[in-house]
Each structure stands twice: as C-alpha cells, then as structure tokens.
C-alpha cells in the first residue's frame, strides 16, 4: 500500500512539474525532491522518466473516461451515446457541454495534463501526434458519429457530419484555450459557450430555405 501511495505521489509531482516547465526541462532528481525521496529510490517505482510520462498518459486517459462516463460521454464508443443525443433539447445539450467544459478546466489532473501536452506538442513529433489524437481527432470523430446518426434519423439537417463536427467542436476548444491562458475570463467564456451551443443547435434543426426559381 505504501509503495502504491509513493508511486501516485511520483505521478502527481511529475505531472505538476511537466505541466509548468515541460518534460525535457524536468529531471528525475527534481521529481524525487518534490516527492521527498532520493532519486535512486524513485527508480524502485519507475525505470525511467519516460516510464513516468507514459504512466501519466495512461492514468489520465483512464480517469477521463471514468469521469465522463458519469455524464454519458463515451468518446471511445460513440454508439453508446447516440440515444442520449436523440431528441435532446438545447438546454440539455448546453448542460452536457457546460459540464465537460468545467470539468476540463477545473479537474487538476486533466487540466495539468492538457497544459503539459500543449507544451510538449512542439518538442516531439510523437507527442504532437498524441496531442492531435487526444484533443482533436478523436473528439471530431466522436461528434461526427453523433451527427451521422442524427442525420440518418432525420433529426438534423443532412449536411456533411465531419464539417458539422468541426463547426461544433472548434469554438469549444478555442474557449478552453482562452481559459487556460486567462482564467479570469471563465465567466465570459461560459456565456460565449452557451451562445455557440444554442446557435449551432438552432441552425442544424432549422429547415434550410427553399431555393427560389430564377
């Protein structure tokens, strides 16, 4: 039990340091010092700094999936979520987006991980690809799957689902970025988020105007 607690303290300390300064700028000795152990003792828990990083990636992904399960968001299984979006109201949709937005900003591990990856995407092609998969591609694929199902059910306009996903997701990611850089603007960003969600909802549910004859 004590060994597991020390392992978690190492992960927490490393994530805090990586998110503030970047992976390459932090040494194993600094992580050990933050935990309150000697550097050689750290190697009893992890064979290398990269092993610590990989464990952070794995643990954060597991935490995110477990936490978002509670609000019916399963990014790894879009089919599971389609019923939750069927006949959803604008109010219910905004509440779902608001919850995930605030969770992304205020959960310490999730927020720190995103900040770490924001730094590291410019330092390593491998981590740049991981950033794109984690924060762009899988989110777009998830929402495109939702829109594809809603189009097939005749619930929203039959537009390209991949383009709809970009139109829907991009402002949300932009507002999270604003709050990461300027936390004092959170109230403003929440208001903008609500305006975006409600406008998008209205646009995809409205019938397109009939074409006029020349």
Give residue spans per PLM region.
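Short, basic, alpha-helical segments at the C-terminal edge of helix-turn-helix-like DNA-binding modules
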Residues: 58-64, 71-72
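Hydrophobic alpha-helical connector segments
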Residues: 69-108, 165-168
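Hydrophobic/aromatic-rich alpha-helical bundle segments in the mid-to-C-terminal region
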Residues: 129, 133, 137, 147-199, ...
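Helix-turn-helix
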Residues: 9, 17-59
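Amphipathic alpha-helical packing segments from all-alpha helical-bundle domains
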Residues: 105-118, 125-152
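N-terminal intrinsically disordered/low-complexity leader segments
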Residues: 1-5, 75-77, 208-214
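Helix-loop "lid/cap" segments that line or gate small-molecule binding pockets
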Residues: 83-84, 98-106, 114-122, 200-204
């Amino acid at each position: 039990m004590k060994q597991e607690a020390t392992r978690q303290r190492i992960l927490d300390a490393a994530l805090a340091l990586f998110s503030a300064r970047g992976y390459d700028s932090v040494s194993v000795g600094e992580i050990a010092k933050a935990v309150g152990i000697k550097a050689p003792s750290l190697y009893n828990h992890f064979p290398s700094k990269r092993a610590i990083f990989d464990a952070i990636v794995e643990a954060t992904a597991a935490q995110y999936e477990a936490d978002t399960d509670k609000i019916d968001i399963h990014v790894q299984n879009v089919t599971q979520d389609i019923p939750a979006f069927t006949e959803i109201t604008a109010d219910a949709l905004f509440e779902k987006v608001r919850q995930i937005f605030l969770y992304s900003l205020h959960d310490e591990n999730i927020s720190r991980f995103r900040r770490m990856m924001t730094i590291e995407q410019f330092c390593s092609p491998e981590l740049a690809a991981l950033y794109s998969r984690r924060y762009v591609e899988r989110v777009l694929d998830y929402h495109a799957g939702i829109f594809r199902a809603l189009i097939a059910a005749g619930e929203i306009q039959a537009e390209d689902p991949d383009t709809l996903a970009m139109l829907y997701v991009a402002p949300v990611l932009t507002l999270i970025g604003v709050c990461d850089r300027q936390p004092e603007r959170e109230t403003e960003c929440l208001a903008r988020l609500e305006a975006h969600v409600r406008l998008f909802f209205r646009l995809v549910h409205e019938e397109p105007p009939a074409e006029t004859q020349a």
